[in-house]
Amino acid sequence: MKKYLGIIVDAVSRRQFKGEITVENGKILRVEEKEHDHERYILPGLVDAHVHIESSMTVPSVFARMAVAKGTVAVVSDPHEIANVMGEEGIDFMLGDSKRSPLKVFFGVPSCVPATPFESAGSVLDAEAVDRLLAREDLYYLSEMMNFPGVVLGFPDVMAKLESAKKCGKVIDGHAPGLRGADLETYIGVGISTDHESFTYEEAVEKIKLGMKILIREGSSARNFETLYSLIDEYPEAVMLCTDDSHPDTLIYEGHIDKLIRRGQEKGLDIFNLIRAAVINPVEHYGLNVGLLREGDPADFITVDDLKSFNVLSTFIDGECVYENGKVLFPMKKVPAKNVFNRNKISIDAAKLAVPAEETGDRKEGMRKIRVIVARDGELVTGQELAFPKVENGNMVSDPEKDILKMVVLSRYADDPVQIGFIKNIGLKEGAIASSIAHDSHNIIAVGATDKDIVEAVNRLVENKGGIVVGTAENLLDLPLEVAGLMSTLDGVEVASRYRLLNEEARKLGTSLESPFMTLAFMSLLVIPELKLGDKGLFDVTKFEFVELFAEE
């Protein structure tokens, strides 16, 4: 039996008082008022309501070390990324490795593997596989249903997955960027209960009024807190907090859910509403076995210096102190590498990177315009515009002066043809960046100032069988990711440090993006508008069809 004194923040009854909690056998035995001189605050541990652990570039047991240091005791996690690469084997890897740490990880069943039929993935989880996985007790919900056209149009395989979740009594997570009106009503009507993709206030309010829970996302690239934070006070029972995709440097240097508690208070939000969004709502919505600092609950709680600065002093999970005084108190265990990577190196000629410009007599420049992806810093959605390409020796090349760069996507699963597009707002003046983290099928994606830079960056990835790369053809820096080409087995601090070096190098090469590799990773995600490049071609998400690089006359 252990006792802890502090100012207890009772989020359920919305009050603070000096008191003592008694813990026995991993449970909270008593919570009682008691006078003392301790100034620390005791409150329920935080919950990330939607996260892809793979985006931390660390395996679950290493991610846990970063999370508990920020007061996180549980996460609702979608193993969608590794499932696209390794299928059920990848899901089992995540489950197994998560047990090497005390962090409570509640995995879901990926609903869209692959995300679309328009790209190559390492696995397919069809309706039969999803039904089988949902029957498992160690998988808690149906992960984000990204195929909203399939829901609205009633595709049989999509509807079968939704019915399996209902049959098992499990929550269905949503993913519906920009979905409004009648289509949204249809989407919610089939039982989809959450959305973390709202990028306007009006869209989020419409979804809440139709019965959805809104997850306010603040990750490394997609950041919606500034737009949506007022919902926390306006609709306190309908909002949760999540990161979705956070890189290791963000987790270590900026924080996890704790940073949103701080920012919310800076905005003048009610502290109890913030804690409700960060703890109570996800626990209740997903039915998580996570304590809310009540008698009889699991002893999952944190102590902080004060509620404004919200510096986490200690973290307890099931009554055990797992973090205190700046130290993680559970060991880091060796993790075996697992991967699927079947690509050989490329060359400029073999990859056909030299794409001829098409001439026309209708333009003063004497050539046809091309479709250009327009990246937006801090957002997953892109725009598109038409532009005249830069041409050398009859071939289209990157144009760093106009910030229109060549981008390639190629399958990691086979030596299939290289797909070529052009992108604006990456900002490189020289060199290239490349990654095997490329949502959602995690093929190889690269952007560069010259074809040579692109080829050398891609080939370094092939040598490493995955990871991220930055630099010029003559001087490349890399971070190998030996687990599925998505995650490292190194300590989170080391991964974060190396990742920061790569970001700094990318900035030296000209980019001003806050998180260039995170932005790059979403330029092949064919379910988020507007124009993306997959391993089978240029894809207009709004039209849900492939389009030609050259614009129509």
UniProtKB/Swiss-Prot annotation:
Reactions this protein catalyses: adenine + H2O + H(+) = hypoxanthine + NH4(+)
Keywords, comma-separated and alphabetical: Hydrolase, Manganese
InterPro entries with a match to the protein in the record: Adenine_deam (IPR006679), Adenine_deam_C (IPR026912), Amidohydro-rel (IPR006680), Metal-dep_hydrolase_composite (IPR011059), Metal_Hydrolase (IPR032466)
A Pfam family it matches: Amidohydro_1
Gene: ade
Organism per entry: Methanosarcina acetivorans (strain ATCC 35395 / DSM 2834 / JCM 12185 / C2A)
Family: Belongs to the metallo-dependent hydrolases superfamily. Adenine deaminase family.
Entry's Gene Ontology molecular function annotations: adenine deaminase activity
Disulphide linkage map: none
Gene3D superfamilies documented for this protein: Metal-dependent hydrolases (3.20.20.140), Urease, subunit C, domain 1 (2.30.40.10)
The EC number(s) this enzyme carries: 3.5.4.2
Lineage top rank: taxon: Archaea
NCBIfam families, alphabetized: ade
Cofactor: Mn(2+)
Protein name as catalogued: Adenine deaminase
GO biological process: adenine catabolic process
